[in-house]
Amino acid sequence: MSKLKLNPYFGEYGGMYVPQILVPALKQLETAFVEAQEDDDFKAEFTDLLKNYAGRPTALTLTRNLSPNPMVKIYLKREDLLHGGAHKTNQVLGQALLAKRMGKKEIIAETGAGQHGVATALACALLGLKCKVYMGAKDVARQSPNVFRMRLMGAEVIPVTSGSATLKDACNEAMRDWSGSYEKAHYLLGTAAGPHPFPTIVREFQRIIGEETKKQMLEREGRLPDAVIACVGGGSNAIGMFADFIDEPSVELIGVEPAGKGIDTPMHGAPLKHGKTGIFFGMKAPLMQDSEGQIEESYSISAGLDFPSVGPQHAHLNATGRARYESATDDEALEAFQQLARCEGIIPALESAHAIAYAVKMARECTKETILVVNLSGRGDKDIFTVSDILNGKEV
């Protein structure tokens, strides 16, 4: 059996905990990725798609009215302006190109909020690949606009009714499908989690977020920000923002997990701060589990953060202290969702609203000149019906 070319671990986290039948597929994927990263033609095609199809670089917007503190500037990295409406498009284009390079004809994906599903559907339509998306039945119900978008672009959307009928279960079904079809299909995983080499692949295809932010900050302010802030579910938008700043010790890295109804309740999705290490979804990582080691259901108002585990690099950054991880409740995210709309005329995704909420809270407590950058990971079109129902007093 050939050796791995990349380190599958981040400290103690990560690995490749999958059925033996999938090991050759993952090794083939790793080899293809390493070769593609060294291929100038592949890199040129990926860069061209990001620029001329997806619309990069995205803007870095200085908010005019959001900061509650005159000493604090809050910038937004505008991934909401990317084609598809969220950061997901970056790495999906990369993986879809990689799948074509490997000769795959079909794409299997999972989705929570539907943003990864939409991004996968658009990439498959563009590149002529068959597309199958697994989505928890609960998420199908609460994200109907994205379900329609996926189907409009030719994707087959498969509702998953097992378990909690959310992202965790969609991930399991997608992995199960891939186990029987990997010779012709590529599993296009949507976050920086799962078995090696997915966390590394997703990070590398998302790191453009932080690279652009660093360049734009130096142009605008002549210095790096004091902190970069991003919401964390599986963790792809956050690792995309963090990656280029990890070796910049002056820049604080802050991830914001969903506290749901409250960290002191069972209704949250914060495994980094309140989970225990376990094996899930092909990786060793912090995991929400009960005293018997069974996976507990996560909860968040935002479907894209409703995940009981987290990517292994985030676990490592937390363990080493290089990044810190905070949380924001549903109520705080809802308030930030409305605040950004009213203050700046920008409607954020509920996922991104968690990061906005923490940034405003942090700004309030700053006692010196400070620059914060929030990764506005997606736009809020998909969430307006959910938020409208809540504000009108309906149960969601």
From Swiss-Prot:
Stored Pfam families: PALP
Top-rank taxon, per record: Bacteria
Signal peptide as annotated in the record: none
Cofactor(s) needed for function: pyridoxal 5'-phosphate
Top-level enzyme category: lyase
GO CC terms of this entry: cytoplasm
Pathway(s) this gene product operates in, as recorded in its UniProt entry: Amino-acid biosynthesis; L-tryptophan biosynthesis; L-tryptophan from chorismate: step 5/5
Keywords from the named record: Amino-acid biosynthesis, Aromatic amino acid biosynthesis, Lyase, Pyridoxal phosphate, Tryptophan biosynthesis
Catalytic activity: (1S,2R)-1-C-(indol-3-yl)glycerol 3-phosphate + L-serine = D-glyceraldehyde 3-phosphate + L-tryptophan + H2O
CDD domains: Trp-synth_B
Residues found modified as N6-(pyridoxal phosphate)lysine: K88
Keyword Protein biosynthesis: no
GO molecular function, one term: tryptophan synthase activity
Transmembrane stretches, start-end: none
EC annotation from Swiss-Prot or TrEMBL: 4.2.1.20
Entry function: The beta subunit is responsible for the synthesis of L-tryptophan from indole and L-serine.
Entry similarity comment: Belongs to the TrpB family.
Xref: NCBIfam families: trpB
Quaternary organization: Tetramer of two alpha and two beta chains.
Protein name: Tryptophan synthase beta chain
Organism (species): Shewanella baltica (strain OS185)
